[in-house]
């Protein structure tokens, strides 16, 4: 697990500079990508560093944005890889069948027979559905489990577990 507070949700990341005038490349992880600006100022992983941003335009793979006090390409480049967080209480409530990735990470995953399959290490998305990245004892390599209603019929946050019915060949 990381040192990031459970009260913070990762909503985006900085991918370096855009141009030579201090703009940054911004990747949004919000369902409606441009809504990331609504949560500004955003916080760094330490929960203290503030990033007040304004989107200037859409670009391939995200947005160009200005951040207060970032005025040069070098300053923007220095922020490459910074993850941006918003306090959970500023984000919208989710329907019962939707989850913030941060809430899934660390949950134990069991099959429908009660056998422990592993623990959620990360949530990935390569363009289609989300994938739960599982690791744990008995797994020789990381396993990617499709995060669909068919493969993951139950997510029980109060019990800290997921019940999975993995497609044939996943395990």
UniProtKB/Swiss-Prot annotation:
> What family does the database annotate?
Belongs to the RimM family.
Query: Which HAMAP family does its entry note?
Result: Ribosome_mat_RimM
**A GO term (biological process) for this protein?**
rRNA processing
Q: Which InterPro entries match?
A: PRC_barrel-like_sf (IPR011033), PRC_RimM (IPR056792), RimM (IPR011961), RimM_N (IPR002676), RimM_N_sf (IPR036976), Transl_B-barrel_sf (IPR009000)
Q: Can the keyword rRNA processing be found in this entry's annotation?
A: yes
What organism is listed for this UniProt entry? Ruegeria sp. (strain TM1040) (Silicibacter sp.)
How is the subunit organization of this protein annotated in UniProt? Binds ribosomal protein uS19.
Q: Which GO terms describe its cellular component?
A: cytoplasm; ribosome
Please give the name of this protein: Ribosome maturation factor RimM
Its localization reads:
Cytoplasm
Q: Which GO terms describe its molecular function?
A: ribosome binding
Q: Which PANTHER family does this one have? A: RIBOSOME MATURATION FACTOR RIMM (PTHR33692:SF1)
Instruction: Name the job this protein performs.
Output: An accessory protein needed during the final step in the assembly of 30S ribosomal subunit, possibly for assembly of the head region. Essential for efficient processing of 16S rRNA. May be needed both before and after RbfA during the maturation of 16S rRNA. It has affinity for free ribosomal 30S subunits but not for 70S ribosomes.
Q: Which Pfam families does this one have?
A: PRC_RimM (PF24986), RimM (PF01782)
Encoding gene, per UniProt annotation: rimM
- Domain PRC barrel per the UniProt entry, residue ranges: 96-170
Its UniProt domain note says:
The PRC barrel domain binds ribosomal protein uS19.
């Amino acid at each position: 697990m990381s040192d990031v507070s459970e009260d913070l949700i990762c909503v985006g990341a900085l991918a370096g500079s855009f141009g030579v005038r201090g703009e940054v490349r911004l990747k949004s992880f919000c369902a409606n990508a441009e809504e990331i600006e609504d949560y500004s100022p955003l916080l760094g992983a330490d929960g203290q560093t503030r990033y007040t941003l304004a989107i200037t335009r859409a670009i391939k793979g995200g947005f160009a944005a200005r951040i207060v006090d970032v005025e040069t390409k070098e300053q923007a480049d220095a922020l490459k890889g910074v993850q941006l967080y918003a306090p959970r209480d500023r984000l919208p409530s989710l329907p019962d069948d939707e989850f913030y990735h941060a809430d899934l990470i660390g949950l134990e995953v069991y099959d429908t027979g009660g056998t422990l399959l592993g623990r959620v290490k990360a949530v990935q998305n390569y363009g289609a559905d989300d994938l739960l990245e599982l690791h744990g004892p008995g797994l020789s390599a990381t396993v990617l489990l499709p995060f669909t209603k068919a493969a993951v019929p139950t997510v029980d946050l109060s019990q800290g577990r997921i019940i999975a019915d993995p497609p044939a060949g996943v395990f």
